[in-house]
């Protein structure tokens, strides 16, 4: 009989993320997430409409830099201070904006969340 292949279980996305420092968020389990990239585009693979699309890539990190990068202070200051998971694929920011969870994956040990600002 062939052995079954087991893949590591993907953890559930965080229930909430609270900004602790400029581009660093902490979830309910004390895990640190860094806002690694913010994209603003009218042509995004996550957007189906012709409009400006804002996506943020959050990476779960075990080791963080001591000081925030100077660029992050300028680039990420519009992100909400907290995100709370409202439904299976929607986060609500402290600013009452909705962010759709478009990807939750793990690549070489780094867990990633990709959130897209939902223009309802």
Swiss-Prot record:
Database matches in InterPro entries: TCL1_MTCP1, TCL1_MTCP1_sf
Cross-referenced Gene3D superfamilies: TCL1/MTCP1 (2.40.15.10)
Alphabetized Pfam families for the sequence: TCL1_MTCP1 (PF01840)
GO MF term set: protein serine/threonine kinase activator activity
UniProt family annotation: Belongs to the TCL1 family.
Cited PANTHER family: PROTEIN P13 MTCP-1, T-CELL LEUKEMIA_LYMPHOMA PROTEIN 1B
Identification of the protein by name: Protein TCL1B4
Organism: Mus musculus
């Amino acid at each position: 009989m062939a052995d079954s292949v087991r893949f590591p279980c993907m953890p559930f996305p965080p229930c909430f993320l609270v900004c602790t420092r400029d581009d660093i968020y902490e979830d309910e389990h004390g895990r640190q997430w860094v806002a690694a990239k913010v994209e603003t585009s009218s042509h995004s693979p996550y957007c189906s409409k012709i409009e400006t699309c804002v996506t943020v890539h959050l990476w779960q990190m075990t080791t963080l830099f001591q000081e925030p990068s100077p660029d992050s202070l300028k680039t990420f200051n519009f992100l909400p201070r907290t995100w709370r998971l409202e439904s299976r694929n929607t986060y609500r920011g402290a600013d009452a904006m909705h962010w759709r969870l478009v990807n939750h994956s793990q690549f070489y040990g780094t867990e990633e969340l990709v959130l897209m600002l939902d223009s309802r």
